[in-house]
C-alpha cells in the first residue's frame, strides 16, 4: 500500500480527533452523577430566604437564583392552577396519575417543593362530607394512596410538615 506523507498526516489527524472524541464520551460525567465538590459547596452554603416566599434554604448564589426564577415563573402558577383544578374535582373524577405527573415533572427538588407549598398555601375544599381548609400536604395525602404518598415524601421530605390552615368562612 503506497501512502504519501500528506495522506499519513491526514489519517493520523483523523485518528487523533477520534481518540479525543472517544475519551470525552468515556470520561465525561453523566448528568445527575454525584459531584463531591458541588455537594460540599452546597453543604457549606449559607441559609437564605428565597424572595418574598419566606422559604429558607441552604443555597449557593447560583442555586438561589434558580430558586428565585422558579418562584417568579409562570410554571409555578400553572402547576398550582392545575393542582387546584384537580382538587376541586369530585373524588371520582380525580386522576391520581395526573397529580403525580404534575408534581414529579415540574418540581425538581425539595427546595422547589417548599416554594410550591408556600405559593399554594391553604385552600377551602368542600366536597361531600369534607368541608375543610387544607394545605398542599393534607390535600396530597388524601388524594393519593398511601404507597404514592410515601414515595412522594421520600423525594420531597418537606411534604411531611403541613401548614396550619384557617380559611375564613
Can you annotate each of these PLM segments?
Residues 2-30:
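Single-pass alpha-helical membrane anchors
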Residues 27-169:
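Long, charge-enriched amphipathic alpha-helical scaffolds and associated charged IDRs
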